[in-house]
């Protein structure tokens, strides 16, 4: 979808069509970072508050969010392609790829393929590691991740992070579907989210 308004202050986007990436600035910035001594770069994209479907493809939005305008695989593909652009422009610098959690129990398969193809040097797993903190151990022991432990990308962890109305100013975040400890916390947080 084209955006009619020019967006001259965006970063990594086509200023005349912001939904389209333009990797010239990010690739140049990574080069400058490398020259300054940076030894590792994590490639992420979007804003978790403005366009979370870009940064973390999801199955269901948080309670205060919006329906994703694209299939989550489009977002996963975007992460893979744009991270590969950076890694291939700077093959001597380890680039960390993100955006894998929606793939559930196929995270390690996709990560391994991207590492083998030189598209990324490392894979970071955020939401998926909250749902399944022992996924590396299970993968090393059995050769695969368990589907019934994997992140289902339904955004409860995101809602917990966004819910601020508590004495700590943020609710503890974890995987509500996979860890019963967070079920009551989510119920408490949900009351504050529906009031915002």
Please name every model-derived segment.
Residues 1-196:
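Flavin-dependent oxidoreductase catalytic cores
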